[in-house]
Amino acid sequence: MAKEQSGTKEHSPMMRQYLEVKERYPDYLLLFRVGDFYETFFDDAITVSTALNIVLTKRTADIPMAGFPYHASEGYIAKLIKKGYKVAVCDQVEDPADAKGIVRREITDIVTPGVTYSDKLLDDRHNNYLAGVAFLKEGKTLMAGVAFIDVTTAEFRITTLLPEELPHFLAGLHPSEILFSTQEKERTLLLKKSLPSETLISLLEPWMFSEEQSQTVLLRHFKTHSLKGFGIETAGGNRAALVAAGVILQYLEETRQNSLSYITRIGELHHTEFMSLDQQTKRNLEIISSMQDGSLSGSLLQVMDRTRNPMGARLLRRWLQRPLKKLTNIQERHNAVEELVENRTLRESVAEQLAAINDLERSLARIATLRTIPREVRQLGISLAAIPTLQALLSDVTAPRLQALTAALQPLPKLAEQIESAIDPDAGATMRDGGYIRAGYNEELDDLRSIASTAKDRLMQIQQEEREATAISSLKVSYNKVFGYYIEISRANSDKVPAYYEKKQTLVNAERYTIPALKEYEEKILHAEEKSLLLEAELFRNLCQQIATEAATVQANAALLAELDALCSFAECAVAFDYTKPTMHEGTTLSITAGRHPVLERLLGAEESYIPNDCHFDDKQTMLIITGPNMAGKSSYLRQIGLIVLLAQAGSFVPAESASLGVVDRIFTRVGASDNLTSGESTFLVEMNEAANILNNATERSLLLLDEIGRGTSTFDGMSIAWSMCEYIVHTIGAKTLFATHYHELAELEERLKGVVNYNATVVETAERVIFLRKIVRGATDNSYGIEVAKMAGMPNDVISRAREILAGLEKRDVEIPRQKAPKVNTMQISLFEETDNQLRNAVEAVDVNRLTPLEALLELQKLQEMARSGGY
């Protein structure tokens, strides 16, 4: 701002006004209304010109300027927000004709990535979150408190995490904007590396993060003495999270979001209620987006989303990312889906009603903040009027969850009737010309309209009288905004114009006049129309405010309708795709018969059927080692099992003939890897970081899906790590594990470790080619068919032939991976050395494997190798 403020006294009055406003909003692009344009100046102009690719001009020799028409502002603002900027809109708040001196201007709106109501910015099937993060000590432990809100739906939640859990949580939440204290600059720089590049970090003053300040703001907003009524205990470890929630409300007030009364609830996100899915798992299972291009196409969500309105779509998205962990809650959803599956008439009738209901959550937010149009208000009334019909359809349901949903719905018949009587069915997309309040709703408005209408009839009468008086048959009475009402006469008839006609305008082929009688009725019409427009706007505001007083009830109905929509979506998928109801239990066993990959079977289409596969885990079978070549279906099989478990715990039926599943607390995946160049991490280090996360956090109730562990390093190093991980999982964790590998030597673990069982992806060899059957069967295989895969990929024949020669030579070598000599495995580490090598034995025994990360284990192994090469000394 220094550059902009220099020489302020030399600027024009308007520019001084601009600089005064800009000084109050230094972090925002200031859009300054000048006539029919929004203008930006100085550095803002340079930024806006570049971001929007519009012309950069100059107001004076030293003031850069860029702008765009006010009527197109929503689209331009949307582009700026998508690029991560914050925008302050400064409008003219008085008519320039009435201004004494410079026109008065005020900030009328502030838009940021996390605070926007614009349809041009929002995806109606996604939430748009604003998050706040605060750090406080609970006892001796530093905790990260997170609050997040979607201002367009009024969803407002808090949660408390350890600082190291924060990156994964925020990456999963995917907020558009995050609020931090300026005291946390270093922490935010580190955190940014794990967030999408478009996420905006807004740094606020530290005083906003005080406990006392936040508590005052929260209690004032919710008009309560405590938050216990929302199930939140201030002393229950939520101190940091409540600070973050208070910061969010302060930020919304600071950004002039004054109509916040529609935000009626705040709740705690209880992690114990949901299966934990880290970002790697969400990405690897392609739950929300495809790994190939990040789009919805090819994702689980694309397959499962048959919702009929945006509220249900947003909830279904959350369900798939937060599967349930409590058995009774899972079974409640399954039973509800089952009834909808079995009762086709009910399912189709409910779906039809849901399709007629608009987005109550976002409509309410726009109505409460007076950002709406009459047509949207009318649609909300129609949606409310549909609730009794839905209740009647659901009156005989037997599933407990459907019964609870039906009973909890609260029709608002009086409000629906008032909206119906107030808003004209033909109300347009704008309010500028009036006519959107229905006739009969307000007596004063009807009278004003009658005056205007009667006066217009009198104008037509004047037109006829003047035609007769002047004998000019083409004379006509017309209107425009500049000259008002006038009489237009062609030049050819100018000699017939009476003396009492007062000229108003001369055109090429006509003259325009007025007369006393026309002036009299013009005043009556314009006065009545002006008052009518003002009264209509007032009536509409009052109606919006009345709707806002019912915000809590409308939001409760919206949540119930969204849940019903998501359950119907699950039911429609179950019917369309031949899914089955899984049997859920509290045990750790898992049994899937003829399971299918929910996404791949849809992509294959009718011309190619998906090959189903079984999967079984119990006390005798806890780890499945799956060998076989690439393209044989190992990775797809791993993902298939993960997706079936996830769908079951989200409340859906599953793609299988039958499924009996113990509730899983977490799903971990280690499938594929790539360099993390921004953090300076190699493929192998990324792989080891992910593997370490699994080993440190998995429990007996977890499901581990591990694909090609150790392939990022040399063969022997990689195999050693894979072997050691298998031992650790079996002996220390006991989690259900699918372990796909090219290391055929790992098949030996079946004989050495209890619970390890070999499976392989079947292949049929013919004289000319290899056929991948994509069937997972019992037993191991010792052939990777890598050369055959290379041939299928189109490698030159010379390369293929030479590869066969090299492979034949390598297979003749007497190369063996060191194996344990002891008949029984009692240790957690592979025995690589003979009994006589005492020094090596002592060195190995001194290693505390329980404290080593996989990477440290690799380094320790390298030291032991060097010792072995030097003869153990």
Swiss-Prot record:
It holds the Pfam family MutS_V. ATP binds at G628, P629, N630, M631, A632, G633, K634, S635. GO terms for molecular function: ATP binding; ATP-dependent DNA damage sensor activity; damaged DNA binding; mismatched DNA binding. GO terms for biological process: mismatch repair. It comes from the Bacteria. SMART domains: MUTSac, MUTSd. Keywords: ATP-binding, DNA damage, DNA repair, DNA-binding, Nucleotide-binding. Coiled coil: none annotated. GO terms for cellular component: cytosol. InterPro entries: DNA_mismatch_repair_MutS (IPR005748), DNA_mismatch_repair_MutS-lik_N (IPR007695), DNA_mismatch_repair_MutS/MSH (IPR017261), DNA_mismatch_repair_MutS_C (IPR000432), DNA_mismatch_repair_MutS_clamp (IPR007861), DNA_mismatch_repair_MutS_core (IPR007696), DNA_mismatch_repair_MutS_N (IPR016151), DNA_mismatch_repair_MutS_sf (IPR036187). Belongs to the DNA mismatch repair MutS family. This protein is involved in the repair of mismatches in DNA. It is possible that it carries out the mismatch recognition step. This protein has a weak ATPase activity. This is DNA mismatch repair protein MutS. It comes from Chlorobium chlorochromatii (strain CaD3).
